Amino acid sequence: MKYVIASDIHGSAYYCRLLKKRYEEEKAQKLLLLGDLLYHGARNALPKEYSTLETAAILNSMKSDILCVRGNCDSDVDTMVLEFPIVAAFAILPVGAHTLVLTHGHNEYAVLKEGDVLVNGHFHVPAFERRGVY
């Protein structure tokens, strides 16, 4: 199965359209969203083409392919416009001999086992790190 992973869209219809286009180009089967989908947050500037309703509509058009965890800017109000669950702090996804542990990453950490892969958002910096389990 092919996955596309995204986080911290913060209501940017512009970047959400790019995400959907890339998802379709990749012919992925699952879109893993790591939170902060609609609201920009009080400390962040408005993102490019900020439109929570358009962003929600784009994401809802892919709802059957989405697995999502909640971010620190996501709220109960978001659940009223999004047609897929966004309330879990973690998601556990078995992939072959490994387990993907999905979280936004802002305040809660799952217990990882040897070979698990932690996938998180929140920091607005793309990175890949290989570490031991502590």
Tell where the protein language model's regions lie, with residue ranges.
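Core catalytic region of metal-dependent phosphoesterases/phosphodiesterases
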Residues: K2-V95
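Conserved beta-sheet core of the metallophosphoesterase superfamily
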Residues: F84-P85, P94-V101, H106-Y134
